[in-house]
């Protein structure tokens, strides 16, 4: 291959994992490397749809404690080791996942983002909890007008991050993002899977029910038993906040399932818009089965 590093990305539930399974069956000289910010956590393999641990072809899955505030910078360090190891062993590295920040940092270089104090993080978290979505959005917009048209009301995670940065530093998050380090690699080919939304939404709904049946509730019980801070990334994985509310008796299980499905569909919708605009050099396909890599 001219480009000896492959990136397979796309929205959640687009078929990335199934495609990688098929590639493993068909070829023996590949290494599948995770690019999903929640699939790194050891305690939540079911609710984050991680591949089986015994699968030797898969790297950077389920190897970080949920106690850790794992970052894109740490992931890039781990990724570099795995990619170089694969290349040294005549394997083709296939980096796959849907975390936009991870992929953007890999392709464009890591932004020099500031450290956020626990005080600011806690204050923003309280605001996010106590304000309505509209109120929280208006607050963030009043502090950082540059988010208009770039960060939207339903994207509470990115709104929180923007508010944290402007509060901590007095500078817009977009000012920080403009200052990037050089990318780790430039010899890659990127594929983006963007299926029909209706198909993705159906898969999201059925997949979450399967996760519940396979033990997702027990995973969340374990997280609660660890007394983790609510701002930690593992506590924000899709489905975790909704199951926590169910376990605390605030909502029924049916309500938790419905809310988690709805929130994940909204996330997929935002991903769809983001991926269409971000990687103009990517080969875009609407079905994982149509992807021809080799």
From Swiss-Prot:
SUPFAM superfamilies to which the protein is assigned, alphabetical: P-loop containing nucleoside triphosphate hydrolases
Name of a matching Pfam family: IPPT
Organism: Wolbachia sp. subsp. Drosophila simulans (strain wRi)
Region feature Interaction with substrate tRNA, mapped onto this chain: 36-39
Chain residues that bind ATP: 10-17
Protein's UniProt name: tRNA dimethylallyltransferase
Catalysis: reaction(s): adenosine(37) in tRNA + dimethylallyl diphosphate = N(6)-dimethylallyladenosine(37) in tRNA + diphosphate
Subunit structure: Monomer.
Classification lineage: Bacteria, Pseudomonadati, Pseudomonadota, Alphaproteobacteria, Rickettsiales
Task of the protein: Catalyzes the transfer of a dimethylallyl group onto the adenine at position 37 in tRNAs that read codons beginning with uridine, leading to the formation of N6-(dimethylallyl)adenosine (i(6)A).
Family according to the record: Belongs to the IPP transferase family.
InterPro entries membership: Dimethylallyltransferase (IPR039657), IPT (IPR018022), P-loop_NTPase (IPR027417)
Enzyme Commission designation: 2.5.1.75
Encoding gene per record: miaA
């Amino acid at each position: 291959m001219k480009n000896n590093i492959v990136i397979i990305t796309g929205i959640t539930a687009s078929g990335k994992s199934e495609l990688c399974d098929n590639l493993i069956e068909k070829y023996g000289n590949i290494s599948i490397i995770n690019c999903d910010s929640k699939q790194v956590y050891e305690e939540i393999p079911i609710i984050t749809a991680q591949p089986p641990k015994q699968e030797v072809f898969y790297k950077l899955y389920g190897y970080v404690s949920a106690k850790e505030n794992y970052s894109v910078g740490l992931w890039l360090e781990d990724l570099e080791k795995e990619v170089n190891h694969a290349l040294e062993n005549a394997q083709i590295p296939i980096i796959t996942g849907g975390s936009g920040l991870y992929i953007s940092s890999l392709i464009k270089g890591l932004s020099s983002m500031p450290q956020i104090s626990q005080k600011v993080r806690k204050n923003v978290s309280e605001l996010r909890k106590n304000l309505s979505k509209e109120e929280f959005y208006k607050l963030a917009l009043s502090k950082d007008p540059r988010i208009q048209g770039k960060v939207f009301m339903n994207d509470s995670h990115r709104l929180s991050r923007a508010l944290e940065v402007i509060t901590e530093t007095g500078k817009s998050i977009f000012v920080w993002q403009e200052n990037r380090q050089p990318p780790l690699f430039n010899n890659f080919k990127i594929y983006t899977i963007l299926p029909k939304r209706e198909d993705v939404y159906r898969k999201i709904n059925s997949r979450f029910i399967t996760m519940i049946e396979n033990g997702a509730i027990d995973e969340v019980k374990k997280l609660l038993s660890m007394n983790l801070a609510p701002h930690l990334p593992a506590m924000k994985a899709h489905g975790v906040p909704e199951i926590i509310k169910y376990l605390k008796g605030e909502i029924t299980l049916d309500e938790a399932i419905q809310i988690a499905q709805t929130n994940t569909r909204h996330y997929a919708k935002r991903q769809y818009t983001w991926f269409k605009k971000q990687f103009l050099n990517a080969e875009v396909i609407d079905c994982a089965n149509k992807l021809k890599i080799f």
